[in-house]
C-alpha cells in the first residue's frame, strides 16, 4: 500500500468516526476520550511516511471538519521500551500491521513528528 493510500484510508475511517460516534456523543453532552486522533495522522503519515505536511493537513481538515479536541495529551515512551513491547506482542501473535513492520527510522520520524506537534501547540 502506498503512503498516500494509507493517508486516505486512515482519514476515511476518521471521517466515519467523527460523524457516527463523536458528533452524536458531543451533541448528547458526553465526555469523549480518544486514544488517537488527527495528530496521529500528522505524526505517522506526515512525518513517518514523509508525506507533504500541507497536503496531510488538507486531508485531515476534510475528514474531521471543525471537530477538534479541546486537549491533546502526549505520552512518549522511549523507543527502546516501545521496541521491546512491540517484539513481545509480535511473539504472542503472528499478525503484524504496517506500523509494526516499519523500520526503526520510521519510528524515530514519528516520534520527532509528535514532538514537533507538541512544540507547535503547547498547552
Spans of features found by a protein language model:
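ATP-dependent small-molecule kinase phosphotransfer cores
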Residues: 1-64
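A glycine- and Lys/Arg-enriched "phosphate-lid" helix/loop adjacent to the NTP-binding pocket
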Residues: 42-113
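PAPS-dependent sulfotransferases, especially Golgi type II membrane carbohydrate sulfotransferases
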Residues: 96, 120-121
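Post-transcriptional modification and biogenesis factors for structured RNAs
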Residues: 117
